[in-house]
């Protein structure tokens, strides 16, 4: 994942994250430490299972970043197009929108780094139950708020401090309290949340244009739109590959709980925007070239063995006596 130094005093680096918690967060954390109480977004069952696994919750930790996403240049090719007839001119290449990919990745890094900074201030060994949310503002085009939130935990007794990553950071995981306990009992420990992001655009070519144009001809039959299928494949593979690379860089043996979220949209063309603004279309349907955008986010928890000699307990059958 890329590194960043977007703000004074903020340095993002996968091996040495140095981000100070904001003053209000520092005050809240100091109060938690002084009162010797904890806060948690774990359920009652998750809380009890985390304690049974040897960890004490310390407090809810939060990181956020309101990020402006910049302008994306688009690359074109001179060539021929088949549509209704044959034409020659400029066409957009199917391509990753790297400016958008990088912006969404850096914003999530900032949010997670600030969450880790709060956990570090609490003396935590890690953060469990992490959620990553994104909110957009109607009043701010191009603005998005990226939020990371979870419960900081610390191992009890002699194990305290031993679950931090090899870089001295608290581990992060989106596993629930139940899954966290099961993972530890199976002889593995979480290392870090690993992310992969890709925003990919496919610009409607002549064949795709025919497939999607009206009820006559090719537009009136069931068929796969292969250009858009390929775009979703490309976005998925790029995002998952980046997530796997990040896990490998941490020395992980694998990734568990992996999930991906994909948002797809079909944009309006420049001509359609001009028609809406100038009202030159008079309600007539517009047959303009459009772009298909696949926005994909992959996330999971990288894990490593606790030790080579650990044996997984055999499952046992328990029969309730209360009927």
Regions inferred by a protein language model and the residue ranges of each:
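Intrinsic disorder/low-complexity detector
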Residues: 2-100, 143-228, 269-323
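Short, well-ordered alpha-helical segments
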Residues: 61, 75-81, 85-131, 210-269
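Short active-site-adjacent helix-start/loop capping segments
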Residues: 69-71, 136-137, 264-266
């Amino acid at each position: 994942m890329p590194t960043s130094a977007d703000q004074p005093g903020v340095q993002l680096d996968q091996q040495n994250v140095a981000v100070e918690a904001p003053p209000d967060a520092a005050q809240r954390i100091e109060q938690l430490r002084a009162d010797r109480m904890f806060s948690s977004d774990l359920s009652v069952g998750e809380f009890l299972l985390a304690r049974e696994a040897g960890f004490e919750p310390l407090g809810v930790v939060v990181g956020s970043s309101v990020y402006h996403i910049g302008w994306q240049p688009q690359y074109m090719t001179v060539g021929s197009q088949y549509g209704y007839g044959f034409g020659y001119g400029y066409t957009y290449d199917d391509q990753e929108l790297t400016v958008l990919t990088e912006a969404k990745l850096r914003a999530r890094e900032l949010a997670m780094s600030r969450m880790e900074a709060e956990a570090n201030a609490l003396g935590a060994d890690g953060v469990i139950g992490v959620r990553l949310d994104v909110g957009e503002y109607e009043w701010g085009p191009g603005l998005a708020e990226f939020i990371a939130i979870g419960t900081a935990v610390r191992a009890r007794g002699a194990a305290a401090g031993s679950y931090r990553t090899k870089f001295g950071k608290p581990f992060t995981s989106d596993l629930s309290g139940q899954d966290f306990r099961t993972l530890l009992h199976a002889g593995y420990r979480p290392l870090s949340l690993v992310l992969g992001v890709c925003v990919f655009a496919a610009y409607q070519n002549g064949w795709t244009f025919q497939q999607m144009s009206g009820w006559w001809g090719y537009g009136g039959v069931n068929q796969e739109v292969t250009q858009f299928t390929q775009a979703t494949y490309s976005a998925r593979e790029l995002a998952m590959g980046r997530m796997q690379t990040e896990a490998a860089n941490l020395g992980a043996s694998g990734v568990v709980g992996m999930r991906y979220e994909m948002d797809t949209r079909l944009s309006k063309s420049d001509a359609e925007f001009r028609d809406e603004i100038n009202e030159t279309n008079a309600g007539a349907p517009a047959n303009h070239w459009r772009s298909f955008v696949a926005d994909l986010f992959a996330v999971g928890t990288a894990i490593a063995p606790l030790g080579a000699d650990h044996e997984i307990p055999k499952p046992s059958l328990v029969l309730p006596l209360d009927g």
